[in-house]
Amino acid sequence: MASEFKKKLFWRAVVAEFLAMTLFVFISIGSALGFKYPVGNNQTAVQDNVKVSLAFGLSIATLAQSVGHISGAHLNPAVTLGLLLSCQISIFRALMYIIAQCVGAIVATAILSGITSSLPGNSLGRNDLADGVNSGQGLGIEIIGTLQLVLCVLATTDRRRRDLGGSAPLAIGLSVALGHLLAIDYTGCGINPARSFGSAVITHNFSNHWIFWVGPFIGGALAVLIYDFILAPRSSDFTDRVKVWTSGQVEEYDLDADDINSRVEMKPK
């Protein structure tokens, strides 16, 4: 922890998470204003769902490309938790990232509140359960939506892979859009605790808010379990890997594989 605390690059990464999260929330929630969440019996029109989903997905893809080389562009506490459990970042980095993400979301939502105060029924994108959706169902939707997102992040950023092509930020952005297409009509789609937290703070309404922390965190943890221990298990000892939690982020890796079909292993230099 001490080694990261003293590095300018670390604090630049924290600032990058804050700035990118501020832009993400402003752009994405700004696109959704005018649509009242949670939706009622008369659900939002398909074209509205697509517009909002694309805004969330494209903003993540754009900002991931912009700051990915600085902070990794987590922009989501569930993603940060997933990478922590995957032993790719330290506990200190995860904590500072989550704080930066939450503060960025609050700042962005506060700015939006001032700009859009005249909009009728302005919920500032606050997440809540739709009519007829109970807390268990909403929790399940948030778990599944976040699971597929964090699974995509782990797979598209896996440095052991030699078959990766295309754009990882675009793939992750599409995963975010997919999650929204699934969840908008049920929960307004959280799958990002910081984004949900910003709206709850500014509107002073924390109704069912726990769902939008517990669901994404469970989904993120399940994604790590599935990817790191079932789909693409790592051969290195787990007790060695968890040293990253206190020593700092792993930045360089040795790739050990005979061919593209062999299982490869990530080993910190």
Curated annotation (Swiss-Prot):
Pfam families assigned: MIP
- Residues buried in the bilayer without crossing it run 69-82, 187-199
Q: Which residues lie on this side of the membrane: Cytoplasmic?
A: 1-11, 66-68, 83-90, 154-163, 225-269
Q: Where in the cell is it found?
A: Cell membrane
User: Catalyzes what?
Assistant: H2O(in) = H2O(out); nitric oxide(out) = nitric oxide(in); CO2(out) = CO2(in); glycerol(in) = glycerol(out)
Q: Subunit composition?
A: Homotetramer; each monomer provides an independent water pore. Component of the ankyrin-1 complex in the erythrocyte, composed of ANK1, RHCE, RHAG, SLC4A1, EPB42, GYPA, GYPB and AQP1. Interacts with EPHB2; involved in endolymph production in the inner ear. Identified in a complex with STOM. Interacts (via the N-terminal) with ANK1 (via ANK 1-5 repeats). Interacts (via the C-terminal) with EPB42.
The protein's name = Aquaporin-1
